[in-house]
Design a protein with these regions (language model features):
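Assembly/oligomerization scaffold segments
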Residues: 1-109, 166-168, 189, 193-206
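Acidic, small/polar-enriched beta strand-loop surface segments
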Residues: 2-7, 46, 161, 165, ...
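Short secondary-structure junctions
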Residues: 17-19, 128-132, 309
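Short, surface-exposed secondary-structure junctions/capping segments
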Residues: 33-37, 91-94, 208-218, 331-338
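Generic recognition of long tandem-repeat/solenoid scaffolds
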Residues: 37-42, 94, 179-181, 271-273, ...
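Terminal peptide-recognition signature
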Residues: 39, 124, 317
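Charged- and aromatic-enriched interaction segments used to assemble
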Residues: 86-209, 372-379
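Short solvent-exposed strand/turn elements
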Residues: 88-106, 327-347
């Protein structure tokens, strides 16, 4: 049995107090560096929290073998508190974002020279705001050197995200409110994540949008020009990106143009599942949960089997929305083709099947059986 505990600490403090709460909604997305939180609490909790306080959401499960059986799901700073009376019912709503909000919202002037992408991020995040930046895998720095990184009376965040994308990296907030810098696409099958119709999927929705799609993509940098043509958008729409702040070679400007094409062409499959990640049975099956991922997270590459949508492949999680009310919780997961964030390197996953096609069993028992088979194969 799992449960959710929500705590609050005053700004600048690490002394947390537990809150009573009615419902919680957490959103994590590859397109937004910060996690966002919407939290509804009884009016009795109003005096316990204030703007800029820190809120953490923790997931408790008796099968978690480390950290006293609980893990953080997110850590945010409070942006807004609203007191509401509705048909005699009184409650407060709290909105919050990850600590990286301070980098995004702040504007100042600075420069770094001859530093790697990781070092630049550390200078900005840790040096100015005390936010740790961890490269995944840990203990190494595979990022490339940026000759000059400068910003003037602005937030450096957009430049930093562009610099990461130029190198095939992505920034994400982690559960503790720090930042991860990792290559696009993390293999989640190693922790036995899987999404399959008839097993753990409650509903499926597929969306195709052309609002941000163009026929021609042009990326300009240091006198070089990269182009990509989308034959599936047969019109005169053109998008030009000026990345003159970065000295990109021809390969990189071509890659950026191609990634813009894939991203704006995207077809999103959204599924709803019970819980926020692995089932109790899956968590219990690990000898230790230390260094294991237990929650669905953006940037995961995950086996997907949804015959009704014509899907039997590996897809990337672009967004997760967790919801909970008392003891009931579920989540909505947005899936895209890996090339949307990985470029051509991600196209190989369209042929990486789930291994479920043709199997007759359905339901939870089949789900557990499939997980057990994957675990045996991994040993």
């Amino acid at each position: 049995m799992s449960s959710i505990v929500i705590n609050v600490a005053p700004a600048g403090s690490k002394v947390f107090k537990q809150l009573q709460w009615n419902r919680v909604h957490i959103k994590k997305s590859l397109d937004e560096i910060c996690h966002s939180l919407t939290l509804e609490l009884p009016i009795s909790q109003k005096d316990l929290l204030h703007k800029h306080d820190t809120i953490e959401v923790r997931f408790y499960n008796k099968h978690i073998t480390h950290n006293n059986g609980n893990l953080r799901v997110t850590t945010v700073r409070i942006d807004e508190i609203t007191d509401t009376t509705d048909s005699g019912r009184k409650y407060i709503t709290v909105l919050g974002r990850s600590p990286a909000r301070d980098i995004i919202d702040s504007t100042w002037t600075g420069t770094t020279e001859s530093a790697t992408l990781l070092q630049v991020a550390e200078t900005i995040a840790k040096g100015s705001f005390g936010i740790e930046v961890q490269h995944l895998p840990r203990g190494v720095d595979y990022t490339e050197t940026i000759p000059v990184f400068a910003w003037d009376c602005e937030s450096p965040w957009t430049q930093l995200v562009n610099a990461a994308e130029n190198q095939g990296y992505v920034f994400t907030s982690n559960e503790a409110g720090e930042l991860y810098l990792t290559k696009s696409g993390r293999d989640a099958s190693q922790w036995h994540f899987i999404l399959a119709e008839g097993m753990n999927i409650k509903s499926v929705e597929t969306t195709e949008s052309g609002a941000e799609q163009f026929h021609e993509y042009i990326v300009v940098s240091s006198g070089l020009e990269g182009r990509a043509i989308d034959p599936l958008c047969n019109n005169k729409r053109i998008l030009t990106l000026n990345l003159s702040d970065f000295k990109l070679d021809q390969e990189k400007v071509n890659r950026r143009a191609q990634i813009e094409l894939y991203r704006r062409r995207r077809r999103t499959t959204t599924v709803t599942v019970s819980g926020w990640g692995l089932t109790d049975a899956q968590i219990k099956s690990f000898e230790t949960t230390h260094e294991k991922e237990l929650f669905f997270n953006p940037n995961f590459l995950i086996p997907v089997y949804i015959p009704s949508a014509g899907l039997d492949c590996t897809m990337m999680i672009s967004e997760v929305e967790y919801r909970a009310e008392s003891s009931v919780f579920d989540c909505t997961i947005s899936l895209v083709n890996p090339e949307v964030y990985m470029g051509k390197e991600g196209t190989v996953f369209k042929d990486k099947k789930s291994g479920l096609k043709g199997k007759q069993k359905t339901g939870f028992n089949a789900f557990i059986e499939e997980v057990e088979q994957r675990q045996k194969a991994a040993k």
